A protein has these predicted regions:
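N-terminal amphipathic, basic helical "cap/leader" segment at the start of enzyme domains
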Residues: 1-71, 160-163
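Generic beta-strand structural signal
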Residues: 71, 102, 134-138
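Small-aliphatic-rich amphipathic alpha-helix that forms the alpha element of a beta-alpha
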Residues: 34, 73, 80-124
Length: 163
């Protein structure tokens, strides 16, 4: 089987991480893959990386919303672009698939749009230099799993309709 297809079929979301950091050179490869995601009209969403101490208060929860992952990458996209959600989602997919190909585990954490629409989130965006028009698409947590690798769930019948 083709190695790329194999990676796509075997990647799983991991919801428990060790404290071990992803080496900088590996993280840079993952981020570069995100930069090369397809996007409408060649407009690439912004990436803000290496947020290891994101405050749970901003996420609106008292527990760790990032499952103990040592690295959080936030994907933002320009809300002025009609394809901002699609563009950012492709970046998220590239990040997670590249991570898997490099032996790093990942998970997409939702609520980025809500987080960065809050006053605390807007303050973080301003601090990081993210333009006001950019909205949060997702948090991509990265690290090394602390438990067993998740098994694939059964796929539903009728996913593909051929006409």
């Amino acid at each position: 089987m083709n190695e790329t297809i194999k990676n796509l079929l075997e990647r799983r979301s991991v919801r428990g991480y060790k404290e071990d950091l992803v080496p900088e050179e590996v993280l840079n490869e993952i981020l570069e893959a995100g930069e090369y995601a397809p996007s409408g009209m060649g407009q690439n969403p912004e990436l803000v990386a290496k947020l290891s101490k994101m405050n749970a208060d901003v996420m609106g929860t008292e527990s760790d919303p990032f499952y103990g992952a040592p690295t959080v990458v936030v994907v933002f996209a320009d809300s002025n672009m009609p394809t901002c959600v699609e563009n950012g989602s492709l970046v998220m997919g590239n990040l997670m698939n590249a991570a898997h190909a490099l032996g790093v585990d990942s998970c997409w954490i939702h609520r980025a749009r809500e987080v960065f629409a809050s006053e605390e989130g807007k303050a973080l965006k301003a601090e990081w230099g993210v333009p006001e028009s950019y909205v949060g698409i997702g948090h991509c947590v990265l690290g090394y799993r602390s438990g067993e690798y998740p098994k694939a769930k059964a796929r539903k019948d009728g996913f593909v309709i051929r006409v």
